[in-house]
């Protein structure tokens, strides 16, 4: 079973991940991981921290001479900014007046600060925000890219892109293939399909930054190449759409997830929302894809369409009212270094967490000790589906 765990704080020395369940014999391209890490740091509307960090992955275990061993894989992404926080974030030295200078007592509305402090009895809310920070998604992207490389070896490709920023819809075209989407979104720094809206959105982001405010948006992930029948209908926790939804909602700032036409499908009669079935020499197909490639908790062979709604970043330079957890006085919330919008990097993160769930689903469906064996079994299964 494919599992992973991450550890580390935003201004600690590094983010660390251990992945278990990647088959032996998978060629790992470190450059691909680093390319995704760089993409996560990019995009219009990012804050100043991205000028400090230059994320690169280090592989400390589970890979030898470029090939996975089948044993747990350890990944590390260093935090360069830790050099400025080493005493404040020191794991063993006692707290002093000097290293408590960045103590946080004024929780930010919309963040984990207050409720996390209440739950774990922290009076210095930095103990909460350091882990709840989206900085954790850097190491999660590294995990996801390993899974994307596994998926590619199994004939599965995917891409995440930005559908909307604030009130502006940027997805004005019909669904496209993964390769077509990639070609389009790499032509701008917003990962959007509508090239004619780039300048408008730059202006919107600039105006929002000057106002001390932030923006959210919508993200879409498209997946090509998943065979039918991955996932299950027999138990609630084996439904692939439920697993994908949980993974998406586990990403910082996500407040909604849908599959295919999603919430919009509820507005239409069933005759306009289902995907009619056809058959040819290659097997069964759907004449449309309103359901986003998932029926009954299982893939149906059509492209997967996963949508995610991201709230505006709650760290505001135009700080909102809050209550000091020590004095109980009404004050302005703490202000941490932040972005105006993180919708672009979030699309990379969502792409990668979807990849993790799909890799889990495929390795759970077949013998995944060795890549070649997994490929043989998947090829035989695809052939079986064609003959059904």
Swiss-Prot record:
The record's remark on the cofactor is:
Reduced FMN (FMNH(2)).
Residue numbers binding NADP(+): 40, 46
Q: What is its EC number?
A: 4.2.3.5
The residues the record assigns to binding FMN are 131-133, 252-253, 296, 311-315, 337
Instruction: Name the keywords, alphabetized.
Output: Amino-acid biosynthesis, Aromatic amino acid biosynthesis, FAD, Flavoprotein, FMN, Lyase, NADP
Q: What class of enzyme is it?
A: lyase
InterPro entries for the chain:
Chorismate_synth, Chorismate_synth_AroC_sf
Q: Name one GO biological process term.
A: chorismate biosynthetic process
Which GO molecular-function terms appear in the entry? Answer: chorismate synthase activity; FMN binding
**Oligomeric state and partners?**
Homotetramer.
This molecule's function is given as:
This reaction introduces a second double bond into the aromatic ring system.
What's the name of the protein? Chorismate synthase
Q: Which organism is it from?
A: Limosilactobacillus fermentum (strain NBRC 3956 / LMG 18251)
